[in-house]
């Protein structure tokens, strides 16, 4: 029996989504272009190509700012669009594993939960994974193993010991 699950890393610049069922990975710019303040004109990389070149009636924005959700409506639109593009035959009930920054508040964490719940992507379960742990797993590091290693990210340095950041 295959598990319908998605791993989502909502970065300020890029969205990364892994679909376990399809063994597919999507990496797109976390941008959206809105025409006349109501119609979606472009998503992801297409919106990025228009950045600073679009006419005045098209607003291009990043729905995330400093790792937290700044525009929930546009972020929901992006999630729905990208997950719909990864699934063949539509989204069925799925588990969602969302990478969240270690240093966010419970209110900010709740915004990530509400984002997935309200995006109409048929979430059965929504679970959070600290970004440092998700990054370690992505680098094929045994995060539960006791070791003396440090990992230097783009802006942060973290130590993972026995699965704790």
Residue ranges and their predicted role:
Residues 1-12, 16-28, 33-41, 45-152, ...:
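Nucleotide/phosphate-binding catalytic cleft detector across ATP-hydrolyzing
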Residues 158:
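Conserved phosphate-interacting/catalytic interface
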